[in-house]
A protein has these predicted regions:
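N-terminal capping segments
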Residues: 1-51, 57-60
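Aromatic- and glycine-rich peptidoglycan recognition patches
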Residues: 3-27, 90-138
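...with weaker cross-activation on analogous glycine-rich loops/strands in unrelated enzymes
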Residues: 48-113
């Protein structure tokens, strides 16, 4: 039996939310097309999957949920679209996510979750309590 993986810093969803807020306020750049990496960094967890859609497809069903308005702070939201899909982090404001490339390309921003679909035509899949095989502390 494998050992349950948790993030190495013991961070909570609020810590991930704050990490993204700081990235936004500092004008962090160089995140274009790096949604999965940015979310991993916010949670301080290692790389595992090559894209957001692969991460979603490898997340066990018991960690997947569909109502975005019930998402706790810090969970990861996923969309299907393009070659790699998209992932973002739930902010402390219900329905709003921290994301890369929206509303401004190559930066971290906070938008209403439907903004990903509106901007790119991506299909909302749901949110998870696990990322890259690591249980999120939410």
């Amino acid at each position: 039996m494998s050992k349950k993986q948790t993030n190495t810093k013991g961070w909570s969803g609020h810590d991930a939310d704050q990490w993204m807020a700081v990235a936004h306020m500092s004008g962090k750049r160089g995140v274009k097309g790096m949604c999965l990496k940015t979310c991993r960094l916010a949670w301080q967890i290692p790389a595992k999957y090559p894209s957001a859609i692969v991460a979603w497809n490898n997340t066990p069903k018991k960690h997947k949920f569909t109502d975005p308005m019930k998402a706790p702070v810090g969970v990861t939201h996923f969309w299907k679209g393009g070659k790699f899909g998209h992932v973002a982090i739930q902010s402390s404001k219900p329905g709003y996510v921290w994301t890369t490339d929206l509303p401004i390309k190559d930066t971290v921003g906070k938008i209403y979750y439907t903004g990903v679909t509106d901007a790119w035509g991506s299909i909302y899949l749901g949110w998870t309590t696990q990322l890259n095989g690591v249980d999120l502390n939410v």
